[in-house]
């Protein structure tokens, strides 16, 4: 890795900051929503109540001796952080720890009636079945009239913005983008991305998924298009091995999304059928590596995952959390070169992300100045700006 100055690791110890608000407000709200969405029994509800107290007022308590992943979490820093306030350990670590403890509270890992039951599934399905999803899927029919390269770019736009990619993933905002004082897309390496997926020769794409539901659907549409038009020969979709960060995609969520597409009419149904066929013949593979839920940056990835990424023509990492893990969850100066902080990555990498946390690299100085002048610091966390960054 190039010799770049170290930036402070983000912790959530300062009231009024975005990370502090996540631990102090968002996590308790998630616990209350989980208890409301699913009729858990008294044991699970007591455990959720205890977690609410612990995550806001208590300290990191190690997993029970019999936990199936205790050794893994010990290697990931559990014992080193034991006894410390959740606000005093790295923010990425405390967030990941919260979701591991939530699953422990609802009996997700233990033998019994709640084993394997996703506590976030009601919210995921509600989004996938929402009328807005019907409208977006119906709008796919209009893409059939576009040339292939325009269709591909529209689908990339949809994958970038997820459920903010309104009106069927159309690129209708492009003209406004070019004249806006502060563009929604604060960094755009999309031409470099397409140069890696030009089909000469066609190779493999790794896509590290972010959210399920209406955000996973456009990821799957993009993969289906790239396969159908020979831009890639196969795709590997990395999902989470268990529920994580409320909406992160698991294998079950992929199957739900494919079923949703297949049941639709028109172009959406055709995409769904192609995806089913690709899963069946191996052109689309699913991976659920344990490190996908690690509280660590990708710089610490194990060798087998490193090999997966090294063998791909391009690895696309979706979403804010994957970006934090890709560049390191630190207060980087926004103009820190993206290529420098990702130099360790074993192959070409592309980040597609809407901005929902303080971590940002690779901005032009004039872009940072314009953003700060127009919005103060809100642009970092509001989700109204996005980026496409590529390192080859």
Enumerate the predicted regions with their spans.
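Conserved structured core elements
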Residues: 21, 92, 187, 216-220, ...
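Non-catalytic accessory regions outside enzyme or core folds
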Residues: 1-191, 195-202, 385-392
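N-terminal beta1-alpha1-beta2 submodule of the flavodoxin-like/Rossmannoid cofactor-binding fold
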Residues: 227, 240-243
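Histidine-anchored nucleotide/phosphate-binding helix
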Residues: 214-236
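Residues at the starts of beta-strands that form the adenosine-phosphate
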Residues: 203-204, 232-236, 348
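Structural motif
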Residues: 204-206, 313-314
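C-terminal functional extensions of proteins
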Residues: 2-4, 11, 239-241, 248-392
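Gly/Ser/Thr-rich loops at beta-strand to alpha-helix junctions
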Residues: 89-93, 208-217, 242-244, 320-325
